[in-house]
């Protein structure tokens, strides 16, 4: 305590110095570094004391946030003559901040023995020793405090990624944080900010509600929700007779604005009737994804819970007239929506449930709430809607229920249940479920397992209704079978006959076929923006969360969506993840609406007739029966949440194969992107998604200005311990790129191109080695492209769509072999399972030469992403891997992707892929008692790797989606390019792929004998990759000030190869979630061009070693720099140079966003900790 008090006094003095205007930039920077060191010591020494003193808040605000805000304002000032220099400084500072929090998280986990799934053990990284030199002075904190500070780090890593326009990476961090402590509302508030920046209104409101309705609500969320609803009330009323999904969502939010703000309640009845009518019409057209329906339901439940907390029913409450009106209208809307969803479920078949179009998840959530609120059955709204119960009876009987279905309830959470952890309105209903396993605990494997589990839940709920409300439903059991019956006459529900274009969702749902939407759960956020997704008049609008939805080129997004439709039927789950169209939809919403109106007039008319007939048959009010309107939330409805890690996707928290992938996407473990310079030992498996960087523009609120987002953790931290074993999600784009159709041909051409690229890359590597800093500075501005790399890579990219698609599809074949040797030894990025099987073998032979050639140059993923609009998204990881492979011999994501994932990091030592040198160094590191960063870049990558390699398959990404996104992730996060991260296995083994059996390819990466890992927690939903794969443009780490442009593919360099490998992005130091989609970072870090200072990873990775080659071969085949000994030399040089030039670099312009700043920081710490262990830093 005395020691920490002393630290605190020193910190106060430093804070005062930093505010002294007389100090120069160098002095302020020095004070900031000292302040960071002091706060870090306090947090590690006495966490409880530090949290009580709000040290974690001061650390963020004074050491990072204030400086970030200042630099952002200067960079946004167009009149500033030094704007480019400021932008470079901002990029470098964000890189350093990301590195700091990544390191802090790693140290906290090591010191307090916290086992986060998103974290790789230090011994396996070869960077830090797991042993602590002095633990006597450390005060053991409460488990809840450990969980809280880890969540704090994850949240701010997400904030930093958001400032860097890496929205997918940011979402992954936020989701991991939410999973770590579900009862804390801050991560949900940050997710809402991300959704808002993407124009996904439904998702925005959903997460604000989630942030409020938890045990520890986030104070700013209530204000944010009020502002959002007030803005909705200011919008004009919809006068169209046929609404699009976007129109519906806007009206739905407006309805809740009236209720929540108690304004103009006289409009509620008319608006409710219109909503019911349009919901009925839209849902019959399958305009909503499962996830959108769940979000709509949860928002209703939030408001109902807000109006009346029926958990305290024993207490007598007196409600005002306004509260009574709001309650009656909202409960009527809720029950009408439930009835409409039941009628839709009757028309659905198993396919719809698998694909994510089915309303059963939302129905299950609705019945959960009714079971907790039995007094609601006495309300008049229930009596008026008794026609819904015969439909429930028919649905339950269609499951052919058995007695064991009622008695043997599973404790494994469904995707919709996993997403609602901590939600107060449903908390009692979820208590019996086992969330301890995180995303991996979600039902995965065969589609039938998840579907059967949901059916069991529904049967149990039906049995409860029969036992407690016999007037509505009765239940009979005979011969082990359960039969549900009812005395209420059933109204016939008919499939709409209209062929008109269904109302398009805001996102790209309209563009997607219903099948596609069902397949993948995608982020509504990105999808909502793509309003221009073009639905053919003949196609039904499918509400899907498009994970790959990007606010970039609409045409590309549309093409991706169309391709996804074609392939989506095959990979419906993955396609749904594409949310790119959603964003475009918003842009083209006017056009779409007009077209939709034309197309949907017929359907609407038919639907209206059907509704009328149904209502006539029913004795209940016709208006209510048919009033269940389905409006499109701009982004939410039309597109499912796209994993933030995916280029355009904002994934919903949980998603599982059983749950229609489009509806739920569980983010894969957060990918801790590290400086690409860090090379992982062959045995170390690092998920590519962790290395991916989201390039999504930070949109309106990249930075939350309100302090509420940074409420003292001491106040926020939950009283109870939180499971720490959940890995960060690894959202990956699930949309299959359209250009993949000629994947094989492309693969062949890519192989040739790769060979050429290898040569070019070798040249580039030499160039890079000569001038590492130049490239890094270039990357910071607009990553310069290595010409040789560009040429070789461009040759493949000449058909950017083809080559990238090929690589994405065949990264396993072409790039994988090249990349495999280097990456496998260090890190194996995941790649499309399909790709892995198709190309791993053919590519391996080329890998050695390719690795050497491609080692340093990194090809940007942006072009790649954009060219195959969603191919990249879907195949992001493989694509990234491909890029990495092409770009960097050392960073061959695709090769490694092709190869099966190696053993978990824990097994790295035993992995045959590990070079003997690395094994030896690892052993030495373990012997060390002090934390030792062998290589700053390596450390970050290691961190990134841990997230990616979180045990388990990617639960959030469909196999293809994961694979695709995995490539993107790898490519994007040049950090991991060398290491084919375990993304392959994740992709191949994604929970979604298993659950839905879609595009499921066994990790056929025979090239690298990597141990198969369990599906990552975040790959639960096949259709919704959660891995941190980012859109190509998103992956680019553009200056935060330029965030608005970074999201546009056009703003990014057109040639993916050039950006990726040409220069190092400013975010080279990006930690776990910072990998830039631009592989440039990886290139710079890994490329030999930085051999002197920043060639940490590539230089040491064997460029020529093939994945099939033993670890020794991979290590030794690579340029001598690939060996640890070789690395030692560069490390010494780099450390000397970095330390000597660190101050000058920072004070001057920080133009080198690459590893320079972060490396220097790490080097300083290294030197402090090494105590003569210089030899132990081989991978520097």
From Swiss-Prot:
TPR repeat positions: 151-184, 186-218
Compositional bias of kind Basic and acidic residues: 547-559, 584-606, 615-627, 1076-1090
Compositionally biased spans, kind Pro residues: 728-740
Keyword Repeat included in the entry's annotation: yes
GO cellular component: cytoplasm; telomerase holoenzyme complex
PANTHER family assigned to the protein according to its UniProt record, in alphabetical order: NONSENSE-MEDIATED MRNA DECAY FACTOR SMG7, SMG-7 SUPPRESSOR WITH MORPHOLOGICAL EFFECT ON GENITALIA PROTEIN 7
Biased composition (Polar residues): 504-520, 692-718, 1026-1038, 1103-1125
Organism: Danio rerio
Record's keyword annotation contains Repeat: yes
Protein name: Nonsense-mediated mRNA decay factor SMG7
Reported consequences of knocking out the gene: Morpholino knockdown leads to a phenotype ranging in severity from weak to severe that includes an elongated hindbrain, altered midbrain-hindbrain boundary, stacked somites in severe phenotypes and a mortality rate of 97% at 5 days post-fertilization.
Record keywords, A-Z: Cytoplasm, Nonsense-mediated mRNA decay, Nucleus, Repeat, TPR repeat
Region (Disordered): 496-636, 692-795, 893-913, 1019-1127, 1148-1180
Transmembrane segments: none
First-listed, main subcellular location of the protein, grouped into a coarse class: cytoplasm
Domain of life assignment: Eukaryota
Function: Plays a role in nonsense-mediated mRNA decay. Recruits UPF1 to cytoplasmic mRNA decay bodies. Together with SMG5 is thought to provide a link to the mRNA degradation machinery involving exonucleolytic pathways, and to serve as an adapter for UPF1 to protein phosphatase 2A (PP2A), thereby triggering UPF1 dephosphorylation. Required for normal embryonic development.
Subcellular location: Cytoplasm; Nucleus
Gene3D superfamilies: Tetratricopeptide repeat domain
GO terms of molecular function: telomerase RNA binding; telomeric DNA binding
Biased composition (Low complexity): 741-778, 1039-1065
GO BP term, pick one: nuclear-transcribed mRNA catabolic process, nonsense-mediated decay
């Amino acid at each position: 305590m005395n020691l920490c008090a002393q630290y605190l006094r020193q910190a106060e003095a430093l804070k005062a110095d930093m505010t002294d205007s007389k100090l120069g930039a160098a002095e302020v920077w020095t004070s900031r570094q000292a302040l960071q060191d002091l706060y870090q010591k306090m947090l590690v020494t006495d966490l409880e004391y530090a949290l009580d003193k709000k040290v974690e808040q001061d650390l963020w605000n004074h050491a990072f946030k204030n400086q970030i805000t200042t630099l952002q304002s200067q960079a946004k000032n167009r009149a500033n003559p030094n704007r480019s220099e400021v932008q470079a400084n901002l990029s470098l500072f964000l890189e350093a901040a990301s590195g700091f929090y990544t390191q802090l998280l790693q140290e906290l986990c090591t010191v307090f023995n916290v086992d986060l799934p998103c974290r790789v053990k230090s011994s396996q990284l070869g960077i830090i020793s797991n042993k602590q030199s002095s633990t006597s002075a450390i005060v053991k904190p409460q488990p809840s405090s450990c969980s809280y500070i880890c969540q704090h780090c994850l949240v701010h890593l997400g904030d930093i990624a958001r400032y860097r326009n890496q929205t997918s990476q940011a979402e992954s961090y936020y989701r991991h944080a939410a999973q770590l402590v579900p009862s804390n509302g801050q991560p949900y508030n940050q997710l809402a900010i991300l959704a808002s920046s993407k124009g996904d209104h439904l998702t925005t409101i959903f997460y604000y509600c989630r942030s409020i309705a938890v045990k520890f609500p986030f104070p700013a969320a209530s204000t944010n929700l009020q502002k959002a609803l007030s803005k909705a009330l200011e919008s004009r009323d919809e006068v169209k007779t046929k609404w699009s999904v976007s129109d519906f969502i806007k009206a739905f939010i407006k309805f809740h604005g009236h209720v929540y703000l108690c304004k103009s309640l006289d409009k509620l009845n008319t608006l409710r009737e219109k909503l019911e009518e349009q919901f009925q019409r839209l849902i019959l057209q399958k305009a909503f994804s499962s996830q959108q329906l769940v979000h709509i339901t949860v928002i209703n439940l939030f408001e109902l819970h807000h109006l009346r907390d029926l958990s305290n029913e024993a207490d007598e409450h007196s409600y005002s007239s306004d509260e009574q009106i709001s309650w009656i209208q909202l409960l009527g809307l809720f029950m009408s929506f439930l009835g409409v969803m039941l009628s839709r479920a009757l028309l659905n078949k198993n396919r719809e449930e698998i694909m994510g179009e089915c309303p059963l998840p939302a129905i299950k959530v609705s019945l959960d709430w009714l079971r907790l609120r039995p007094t609601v059955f006495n309300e008049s709204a229930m009596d008026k809607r008794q026609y819904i119960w015969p439909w429930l009876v028919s649905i339950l009987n269609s499951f052919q229920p058995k007695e064991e279905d009622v008695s043997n309830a599973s404790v494994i959470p469904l995707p919709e249940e996993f997403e609602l952890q901590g939600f107060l309105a449903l908390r009692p209903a979820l208590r019996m479920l086992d969330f301890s396993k995180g995303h991996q605990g979600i039902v995965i494997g065969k589609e039938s397992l998840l579907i059967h589990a949901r059916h069991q839940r529904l049967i149990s709920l039906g049995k409860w209704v029969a036992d407690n409300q016999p007037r509505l439903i009765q239940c009979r059991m005979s011969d082990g079978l359960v039969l549900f019956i009812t005395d209420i006459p059933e109204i016939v529900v008919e499939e709409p006959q209209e062929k008109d274009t269904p109302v398009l969702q805001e996102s790209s749902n309209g563009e997607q076929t219903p099948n596609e939407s069902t397949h993948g759960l995608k982020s509504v956020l990105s999808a909502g923006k793509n309003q221009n997704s073009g639905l053919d008049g003949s196609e039904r609008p499918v509400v899907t969360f498009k994970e790959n939805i990007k606010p970039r080129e609409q045409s590309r997004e549309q093409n991706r969506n169309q391709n996804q439709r074609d392939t989506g039927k095959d990979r419906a789950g993955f396609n749904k993840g594409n949310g790119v169209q959603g964003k475009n939809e918003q842009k083209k919403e006017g056009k779409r609406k007009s077209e939709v109106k034309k197309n949907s007039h017929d359907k609407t008319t038919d639907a209206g007739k059907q509704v009328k007939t149904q209502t006539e048959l029913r004795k209940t009010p016709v208006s209510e029966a048919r009033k269940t309107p389905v409006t499109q939330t701009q982004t939410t409805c039309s597109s499912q949440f796209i994993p933030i890690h995916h280029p355009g996707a904002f994934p919903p928290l949980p998603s599982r194969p059983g749950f229609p992938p489009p509806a739920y996407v569980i983010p894969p473990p957060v990918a801790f992107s590290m400086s690409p310079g860090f090379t992982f030992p062959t045995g170390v498996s690092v998920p590519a998604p962790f290395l991916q960087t989201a390039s999504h523009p930070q949109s309106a609120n990249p930075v939350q200005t309100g302090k509420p987002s940074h409420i003292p953790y001491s106040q926020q931290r939950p009283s109870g311990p939180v499971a720490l074993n959940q890995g960060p999600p690894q959202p990956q784009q699930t949309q299959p790129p359209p250009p993949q159709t000629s994947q094989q041909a492309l693969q062949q051409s890519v192989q040739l191109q790769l060979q050429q690229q290898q040569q070019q890359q070798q040249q580039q590597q030499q160039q890079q080695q000569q001038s590492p800093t130049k490239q890094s500075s270039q990357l910071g501005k607009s990553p310069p492209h290595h010409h040789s790399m560009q040429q070789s890579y461009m040759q493949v990219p000449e058909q950017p769509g083809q080559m990238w698609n090929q690589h994405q599809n065949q990264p396993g074949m072409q790039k994988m072999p090249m990349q495999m040797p280097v990456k496998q030894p260090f890190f194996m990025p995941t790649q499309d399972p399909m790709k892995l099987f198709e190309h791993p073998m053919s590519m391996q032979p080329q890998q050695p030469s390719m690795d050497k050639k491609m080692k340093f140059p990194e090809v940007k993923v942006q072009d790649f992403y954009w060219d195959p609009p969603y191919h990249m998204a879907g195949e992001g990881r493989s694509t990234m891997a491909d890029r990495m492979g092409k770009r960097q011999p050392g960073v061959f994501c695709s090769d490694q992707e092709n190869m099966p994932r190696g053993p978990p990091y824990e097994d790295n030592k035993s992995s045959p892929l590990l070079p003997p040198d690395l094994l030896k160094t690892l052993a030495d590191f373990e012997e060390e008692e002090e934390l030792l960063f062998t290589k700053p870049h390596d450390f970050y990558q290691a961190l990134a790797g841990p997230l990616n390699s979180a045990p388990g398959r990617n639960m959030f990404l469909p196999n293809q989606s994961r694979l695709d996104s995995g490539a993107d992730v790898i490519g994007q996060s040049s950090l991991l390019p060398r290491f084919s991260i375990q993304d392959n296995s994740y992709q191949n083994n994604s929970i979604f792929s298993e659950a839905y059996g879609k595009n499921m390819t066994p990790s056929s990466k025979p090239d690298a004998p990597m141990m198969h890992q369990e599906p990552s927690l975040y790959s639960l939903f096949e259709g919704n990759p959660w891995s941190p794969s980012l859109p190509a443009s998103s992956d680019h780490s553009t200056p935060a000030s330029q965030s608005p442009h970074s999201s546009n593919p056009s703003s990014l360099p057109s040639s993916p190869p050039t950006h990726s490998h040409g220069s190092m992005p400013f975010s080279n130091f990006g930690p776990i979630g910072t990998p830039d989609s631009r592989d440039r970072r990886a290139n710079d870090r890994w490329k030999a061009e930085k051999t002197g200072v920043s060639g940490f990873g590539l230089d040491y990775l064997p460029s020529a070693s093939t994945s099939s080659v033993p670890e020794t071969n991979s290590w030794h085949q690579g340029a001598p720099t690939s060996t640890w000994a070789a690395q030692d030399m560069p490390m010494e040089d780099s450390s000397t140079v970095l330390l000597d030039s660190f101050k000058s670099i920072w004070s001057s312009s920080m133009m080198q966003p690459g590893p320079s700043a972060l490396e220097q920081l790490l080097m300083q710490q290294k030197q402090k900790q090494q105590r003569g262990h210089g030899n132990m830093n081989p991978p520097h």
